[in-house]
Amino acid sequence: MANRRQGQRQRGAMLIAFSILLILVLGFIGLALDVGQVIGRKTELQNLADNAALAAAAELVGTPEGLDSAVTKAKSSAADKSAWRRRMQGAILSDASIRFASAPDAPASAWHAAGAVPDPATALFVRVDTQANTPSLGRVTTAFLGAWSPALRTLDTGARAVAGRTSLNLTPLAICALSASAASPRTNAALLPAVELLEYGFRRGVAYNLLKLNPNGPAAEHFVLNPLGPPGVVGPSQQVGESSVLPFVCSGTVLYPRIGSAQVHVHRPFPATLWPAFNARFNQHAGSGCHTITAPPDTNIRAYPNTATNWWMTNTPDAPSALSTGNPLLSVADPEANATPPAVGGYGPLWSFAKAAKYSSVKPAGGYLPFATSDWPKLYPASPAAPAAKSGYPATPPYQTLAYQTAPTGNTGVAQRRLLHIPLLACPLPAGSDVLAQVRGIGRFFMTAPASNGVLSAEFDGLVAEGALVGPAELLQ
């Protein structure tokens, strides 16, 4: 009898213990479910913020219109169903959640709405913060935690992402502008009433040896543009050393997103040993120090001039660029008056990528108008006769025409890798190996042929806005 009562008491105690344990187990299960909901929502919000920030950053080009477009792209990205509510619906981003600044680590007070940015030219970074959004995107209604406390009936979570551009597609080689004027007429009575355009002294359609120019003296002036240090300060010598500069010559980039009106650190001279790095663009990687992944060849590696049967000039140029001579050290194509015409081969190849342009005091909306090949005798007087284009000169420049192209073998090419974006400096510069220089503008030059020691031949194709050279948008935080 006593044993029976003792067994009943034990079963009762076990039932009580089981009930208590069951409550705890259910509590932990509820906690896991509710916390899992919060973690899942936070993951969705982070994906949403990352995507929206990247979409917005791609529109930031230093203009008010770019800021407006960035807001639109961020909202459009969030509205997509790819990252929100188990891919069942999009989210609505409010303006309060989208902010812009001039640096990814800017203090809270330096992040502004699109319409309140002090200087759109510097606003190259965007932050998407879902916790600032209206309505709230991170509020999660709990299923079990509310039973423990009314304060736990809803939980809030959020995510933040910062994206922007950290580079410029700018070659770390700088040269002197040949004049101080961004656009000026070239004196040539034979062309009247038409007038040829000069841009900082350079002529479109003419190839220059970029390592043999100096508008202020007989000795060549060329510089390393510091690819690592921010504009406005002279960086340490390691930043302009050959080993530091080499990968940026290969890629044609620098690691800052903007120059603006700031001065840049330049080092003279540009190292003579770095010329092979330019030739990766022609699929010549051996000995260049460049890798085929970060420095692929161009889709067209044919050098100009060449011996192909469809060569478009009636003469064979002496070199892949116009010859440089004199004091100041200029190409034979540069003197405007009272100059003895050069030999016909001295002009180098003409119009391989760009055509000479007609000057206009106001730049036409569609760009400057080109001259015709029939104008070559007036544009390029020479001895014994001016260079001439064959009747088969293509409607589009030879580089862009299939019959004048050679594709690389073994490596995948990237179009227009032969384009070099070169800072044009306000010269003369102060004496010394490391100085600060003002950038007048950025010239676009097309490599006509592989470089060699002391020779970097590139045809001028006009000026390019800095905002058009910003690197790819990157997720930074």
Where would I find each of the regions flagged by the language model?
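N-linked glycosylation sequons
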Residues: S109-T122, R127, L137-Q477
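Generic detector of ordered, mature protein regions
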Residues: G27-I29, E44-A52, A58, L67-S69, ...
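Alpha-helical assembly-interface signal, strongest on the long, hydrophobic N-terminal helix that forms
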Residues: M1-D80, I422
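Short amphipathic secondary-structure patches
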Residues: A2, I39, T43, A55-V140, ...
